[in-house]
């Protein structure tokens, strides 16, 4: 099987980007080990603190954030970091050429039940003019990413990665410590009969989304004329991994409970990297009003609605918005 380095070289990734990705993945391998220790190492449960999102931090949130932050700050390749667990950007090397945004442990509430969790990341070029503590440099649309991916900590530790030349999935060989290419050039099926959404929030959605989900649930007896299955992992990284492997549609739609938070998922380190992966695999990624990768961020923790997955099903979902106008 091909090693990560060989595939990155084949895809034309520059040397410094390859070295940065390897450095980031060294941190992810340490997170994978910490996660695997669980209660044996006393890393489960919550802390007494909240992050900038107002969410109670799990112990593994904090541990994972420190691992990635320390690893990247010492690398020499990164000018600054933005993280879900940090209020502000974290300055690194003034000579660094890249900016890294990450959710250190997506789905951390799943640690208590030994379910799927993962690390999501995106990488962009650092403007030469920026100071390492300047958050404005992160306010670039997702089209400017040079790499994005996630590491899934499940029965095996897997990496989904794109540098703009297709989406590849690698599996960590824990015997030798390297990521091996196991699923090259993933292509998401254009059609699907599976959907992922937290249906308990249905009353807070726009009427068009409520109508779309109602038609899916109506199955063969409804206007779609076929049965659909609902899958929900409660971790974006797990749901998107399933979509990449066998198709589907993932939705965290506009929610009218809080106008200041029109979506739940953060643009820079959740929506953008997943959108990049999905588009490079032949899928589609939208907010409901436009392409996720074209959203111009206004602040580093900005949230957006997400409709991601098999192209034809995403288009079908969006058509309900068009019909509601």
Curated annotation (Swiss-Prot):
Pfam families according to UniProt: FBPase (PF00316), FBPase_C (PF18913)
Annotated keywords: Carbohydrate metabolism, Cytoplasm, Hydrolase, Magnesium, Metal-binding
Residues reported to bind Mg(2+) 2: 103, 106, 270
Cofactor: Mg(2+)
Pathway involvement of the protein, from the record: Carbohydrate biosynthesis; gluconeogenesis
CC cofactor note: Binds 2 magnesium ions per subunit.
UniProt GO MF annotations: fructose 1,6-bisphosphate 1-phosphatase activity; magnesium ion binding
Reactions this protein catalyses: beta-D-fructose 1,6-bisphosphate + H2O = beta-D-fructose 6-phosphate + phosphate
One of the GO BP terms on file: gluconeogenesis
TM segment ranges: none
Species assigned in the record: Alteromonas mediterranea (strain DSM 17117 / CIP 110805 / LMG 28347 / Deep ecotype)
Enzyme class, UniProt record, top EC level: hydrolase
Protein name: Fructose-1,6-bisphosphatase class 1
């Amino acid at each position: 099987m091909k090693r990560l380095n060989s595939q990155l070289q084949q895809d034309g990734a520059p040397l410094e980007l390859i070295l940065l990705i390897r450095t980031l993945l060294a941190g992810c391998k340490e997170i994978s080990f910490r996660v695997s220790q669980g209660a044996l190492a006393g890393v489960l449960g919550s802390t007494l603190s909240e992050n900038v999102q107002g969410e109670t931090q799990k112990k593994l949130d904090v541990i994972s954030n420190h691992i990635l932050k320390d690893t990247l700050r010492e690398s020499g390749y990164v000018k600054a970091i933005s993280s879900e667990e940090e209020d502000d950007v974290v300055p690194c090397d003034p000579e660094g050429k890249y900016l890294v945004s990450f959710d250190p442990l997506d789905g951390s509430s799943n640690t208590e039940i030994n379910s799927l969790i993962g690390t999501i990341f995106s990488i962009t070029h650092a403007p030469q003019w920026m100071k390492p503590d300047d958050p404005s440099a992160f306010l670039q649309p997702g089209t400017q990413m040079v790499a994005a991916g996630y590491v899934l900590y499940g029965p095996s530790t897997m990496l989904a990665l794109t540098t703009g030349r297709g989406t590849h999935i690698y599996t960590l060989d824990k015997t030798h410590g390297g990521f091996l290419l196991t699923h090259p050039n993933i292509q998401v099926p254009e059609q699907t009969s599976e959907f992922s959404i937290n249906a308990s929030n249905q009353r807070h959605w726009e009427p068009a989304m409520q109508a779309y989900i109602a038609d899916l649930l109506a199955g063969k007896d409804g206007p779609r004329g076929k049965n659909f299955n609902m899958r929900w992992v409660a971790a974006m990284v797990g749901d998107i991994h399933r979509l990449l492997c066998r198709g589907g549609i993932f939705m965290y739609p506009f929610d009218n409970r809080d106008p200041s938070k029109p979506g739940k998922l953060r643009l820079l380190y959740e929506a953008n990297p997943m959108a990049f992966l999905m588009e490079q695999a032949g899928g589609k990624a939208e907010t409901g009003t436009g392409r996720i990768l074209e959203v111009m961020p206004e602040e580093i923790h900005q949230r957006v609605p997400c409709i991601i997955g098999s192209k034809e099903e995403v288009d079908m979902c969006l058509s309900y918005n068009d019909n509601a106008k």
